From Swiss-Prot:
Residues 72-369 form the Protein kinase domain. Pfam families: Pkinase (PF00069). Its main location: cytoplasm. The active site is at D194 (proton acceptor). GO terms for biological process: epithelial cell proliferation involved in lung morphogenesis; ERBB2-ERBB3 signaling pathway; ERK1 and ERK2 cascade; face development; heart development; insulin-like growth factor receptor signaling pathway; MAPK cascade; myelination. This is Dual specificity mitogen-activated protein kinase kinase 2. It catalyses: L-seryl-[protein] + ATP = O-phospho-L-seryl-[protein] + ADP + H(+); L-threonyl-[protein] + ATP = O-phospho-L-threonyl-[protein] + ADP + H(+); L-tyrosyl-[protein] + ATP = O-phospho-L-tyrosyl-[protein] + ADP + H(+).
Length: 400
């Protein structure tokens, strides 16, 4: 008699590179998987709505079977970045709408196979704060990663429409990012490695999810050799090449929050004139209420347009930007515009020494997060109004 295998989530039993087919023991196996799924979901401390949505996603995913290039119909392009192009597609056999990321890599078959193997870990990442994964495969020189489609897009796209994102909305974003990072760390021992607005996705149901985290070391290495990715959200210790941990993700989250709150990438910091244009009134800074610095500063590299129109300042070179992150004071939220709780939360994320920087547990218990957890905020309504999306009948509960 064969040793009984440890049961796993249904997502793990669906190998995207193997065609779906009937199994003589599939009924018994599916019952065992259902029991195990329920146990796994209970461990995640989800509310009923989150549990139902996760179960619905996994049920849909179970119908997908093998993923093949010919089975996808392209609908539109969603964006480009991180060395790949993301398109909205329909998977014809299942009828599901997905987001398909295509990454072109000139690599040997052994490396390619290792990347596909490493990406299978994504089948185990089932959380309300992590974008769902359908599978990965290789075809014609490109690796395809097929994910849940989030109809609100990424927060950098939302920022273009919103100009600035309100503090109460960013409270819900902060909760989701912290819970997503904690899930990856505690359940899978994974660091994200690339937290930034374009890797935080939202949808019209009010869900906020992380994507593009560093699950495949081989893919990270291969892309580093093929693409010069942005380093502008990296923590100082990463830029200096020293050891980094989840604390580096905390820095990236803090920097992202300042960008989303102010309306542009915050290094170098906006001067008094720009802050007045952003907030519609003079903004004070410093302990004694002095007007914010009026010294002219260059704009961030490669960013001629902010949420507030064309930026006529000379561009900062990329090496100047990286030097600024390492050697200059960290960015902060201007005084008199945001609550002290939010300002302090961001400041704790942006401490340059990672040993002194707040960790996930400290931030989860911070007053800003505790307040945001109980605050009634219609995130779905705000997003749909901002992006002119149709709001579904059952948005996510406002208290995330």
């Amino acid at each position: 008699m064969l040793a009984r295998r440890k049961p796993v989530l249904p997502a793990l039993t669906i190998n995207p590179t193997i065609a779906e087919g009937p199994s003589p023991t599939s009924e018994g196996a599916s019952e065992a998987n259902l029991v195990d799924l329920q146990k796994k979901l209970e461990e995640l401390e989800l509310d009923e709505q989150q549990k139902k949505r996760l179960e619905a996603f996994l049920t849909q995913k179970a119908k997908v079977g093998e993923l093949k290039d010919d089975d996808f119909e392209r609908i539109s392009e969603l964006g480009a970045g991180n060395g790949g192009v993301v398109t909205k597609v329909q998977h014809r056999p299942s009828g599901l709408i997905m987001a398909r990321k295509l990454i072109h890599l000139e690599i040997k078959p052994a490396i390619r196979n290792q990347i596909i193997r490493e990406l299978q870990v994504l089948h185990e990442c089932n959380s309300p704060y992590i974008v769902g994964f359908y599978g990965a495969f290789y075809s014609d020189g490109e690796i395809s990663i097929c994910m849940e489609h989030m109809d609100g897009g990424s927060l950098d796209q939302v920022l273009k429409e919103a100009k600035r994102i309100p503090e109460e909305i960013l409270g819900k974003v902060s909760i989701a990012v912290l819970r997503g990072l904690a899930y990856l760390r505690e359940k899978h021992q994974i660091m994200h490695r690339d937290v930034k607005p374009s890797n935080i996705l939202v949808n019209s149901r009010g869900e906020i999810k992380l994507c593009d985290f560093g699950v495949s070391g081989q893919l990270i290495d291969s892309m580093a050799n093929s693409f010069v990715g942005t380093r502008s959200y990296m923590a100082p210790e990463r830029l200096q090449g020293t050891h980094y941990s989840v604390q580096s993700d905390i820095w990236s989250m803090g920097l992202s929050l300042v960008e989303l709150a102010v309306g542009r990438y915050p290094i170098p910091p906006p001067d008094a004139k720009e802050l007045e244009a952003i907030f519609g009134r003079p903004v004070v800074d410093g302990e004694e209420g002095e007007p914010h610095s009026i010294s002219p500063r260059p704009r961030p590299p490669g960013r001629p347009v902010s949420g507030h129109g064309m930026d006529s300042r000379p561009a900062m070179a990329i090496f100047e930007l990286l030097d600024y992150i390492v050697n200059e004071p960290p960015p902060k939220l201007p005084n008199g515009v945001f609550t002290p709780d939010f300002q302090e939360f961001v400041n704790k994320c942006l401490i340059k020494n990672p040993a002194e920087r707040a960790d996930l547990k400290m931030l989860t218990n911070h007053t800003f997060i505790k307040r945001s957890e109980v605050e009634e905020v219609d995130f779905a309504g705000w997003l749909c109004k901002t992006l002119r999306l149709n709001q579904p009948g059952t948005p996510t509960r406002t208290a995330v």
